[in-house]
C-alpha cells in the first residue's frame, strides 16, 4: 500500500444522494440501536453515556462544516451524535458554519477575492485575513470549502462544497442535535454584529442543544434569554496561560474557581491536557482531579482535541480507541462528551468497547498472530515484545528464525542485523559483506556473527514511519534482549492462553548452499528438544515460508502445520496454483493489498483471493496490521479498528498478523458485533466507496491490475543438500564451529565429521 501523511472513511457511500438516504435510514432504526447501547452505569454527571460531538461534521475526511461532512457524521456515528458548528456572521447578519475567523484557512476565498484581505484586531492581536463580516452570503457562495489541515487529503477539495448557513444544515439533515460554538463574540460586537441577537432569532426555527464560547461576557449577555428549556451553556477553556478577553484573567485562574463558572454555564469544554496531561516526552502523567471537581460543582465536562491523524501519547500505541477509553472508561471518572474530527471512532469507543473486561465474551473468532511479538511497543523479537504480545491477547506468537555462524537458530525479523540492532555499524563494520542472493546492498548478516556476539547486541525498535516523524515508544526503544528459538519455545509453553507458535523460515537454500547451515533441521531439532514433537505440549506449531521447497521439506520430516506466504501483491489466484499449494500447505498468508487493492491510499475494490482460498479449505491470514494512521487507506478513517473490522467482518479473513496484538485482540470482544442490528459505526467499508464520491478531476491515477498468481509462481526445485563449509575464525572471536551454549541446537554431527575428514585430506 502507498503510505500517506494523513487520514480515511467507512461505510457504503456511492453519491451525495445515497448519503442523504442513509441519514433517513439512520433515523428509522435509531431508537432500536439506542436501546441496544450499553446500559452500564457511567461515571458522568448524569449517569448517561458520554456524548459524541462531531466537530464540523466528519471533518477528519471532508472539508470542515461541509454538508457532506455533516451527512457522513450522522451516517457513521451513534444515533444521538451532536453536530458542532463554529458560528460566524456575514456582513448581512446571517449565520454560517465555518471553522475559523479567517476564511482563507479552509476555503478558496483568497483565490476568488485576492484583493479583499484586511487586518483586524482580534483579542488585541492584529490579524490579517479574509473575515466573514466583510462578505455577504451571496459573495460567500462564490468560493469552495477545502481542507483546513494541510496534512489531510486534498482529494475532496474539488468536490464543490459550499459554505452553509445553519438553516441549510438543519434543512438538509432534517435532524436535531446541534452545538453552536461562538468563538469571537467580542470581535463581532466591534463590527456591529450581534451574536446574541442572531441566536435568539435562529432559535425560533432551529433546535439548538448546546452553545459554547470562551468569552465570559457573552454568557452574561444571553443568560436568561432562552428560558428553562433552552440550550445548555458550555464555557470553553483555551490554554491555561491564555487570557480570557473580557475579564483579563487567564483560563488557568478561572479554572480554580468552578463555582464562578457555574453561575453562567452548565458545563465546561477543555483540552485533553486539562484532564490527562503529558510530560515533555509525550507520555501520560497521573490524571488531574478536574472531572471530579467539576462534577462536584454540578458542571458537565466535555473534552476537545480528538483526532485520529495527530500525535497522541505513546501510552496509547497509536490507537485512538484506547485514547477515548482513557477519558470515558478509566475506572475513576467519565467525561460527559468528546469533541472529535472522527466521530466514528468516538462512537465505537463509547458504545462497543467501553466497560468490557479482558475476559468478556468473544463476539468473533479469528487468530491474532503477532509480528515479532508486540513490535510496535518494544524492539521486535525480544523477550519484552513477546511477553507483551501474550499479555495483550495474542493467540499465536511468531519467531522469524535466523542462524548465527555457530549454528544457533534465534528470532529476528531480518537476516541483516542492521535492520534490528542499534549502533551495529560501529561495532561490527568489518563483518559487512555483499550477498546478492539476499540483498542488493551490503549488509551485516546474522551468519557472520556467533550467538554470543549476537546476544551482546542492543536491539532497536522499528520506526517504519520515520519519514513522517512518527516514532514508537522511545523510552523502550532499546529495551529487552534477543532470544534463541529454544528460549522462544520455552516461553510459549508457559502460557496456556496461547494456542500456537508460528515459526518463519527464509533463505534456507542460501544458508545450505553457501553457509553450510541447515535451518530446517535446526528448527526441527529445537522443536524436539523443547518437547513440541512428542506431545508433551498442546501448543500448535505452524511453519511459515515463502518457499514451497522449504515447506515440502518440513512436511517430509514432521507433522507440523505449514503456512505458505505469498509475498507478491496479487489480484487473483488460479485453480492450478491453489491445488499445488494444498499439496504442502495448510494455510496461506497474503498481504493487505491482495484483499483490498488501492490507488494512492484509496481502496479501489476487493479481490476474490480470500474467497477462492477458503473455498479450497485453506485458511487465510493477512499481514501487516499496524496502528499508525499513515499505514492505512483513507477508507479506514485513520483508525486501526475500522481497518481490522473491514478485513474480519467485511472480507472474512481467518487471522491478522499484527505488530500491535492488543488492538486486534480487543476487537474480538467488540460488544456491537453481538447485536441483532450491528450499528453503522461497526459496518465494514465499501471498497471503492470514497472514489465514487470524489470529483473526477481529483481521482488518483488508475493502477495496473495486480498479477494473477499461477502454478509457476509456486513450483520450486527441492532444497539442495547442505554443503560442508570449512571453519573460519572471525577477528577476536571463537571459531564458527565452537560449541553452542547449553540448551541450544548444535551443528549436526554429520557436518562436524565432514569438516574433520575434509581437513585431514587437505593436510
Curated annotation (Swiss-Prot):
Which is a GO BP term held by this UniProt record? lipid metabolic process
Which residues get glycosylated?
A: 105, 192, 248, 257, 315, 359, 430, 534, 547, 654
Position of the signal peptide: 1-35
Q: What is this protein's function?
A: Hydrolyzes glycerolphosphoglycerol, glycerophosphocholine and glycerophosphoethanolamine in vitro.
Q: What is this protein called?
A: Glycerophosphodiester phosphodiesterase GDPDL1
Entry comment describing in which tissues the protein is expressed: Expressed in rosette and cauline leaves, stems, flowers and siliques.
Q: Give the family from UniProt.
A: Belongs to the glycerophosphoryl diester phosphodiesterase family.
- Asked if the Swiss-Prot or TrEMBL record annotates the protein with the keyword Transmembrane, the reply is yes
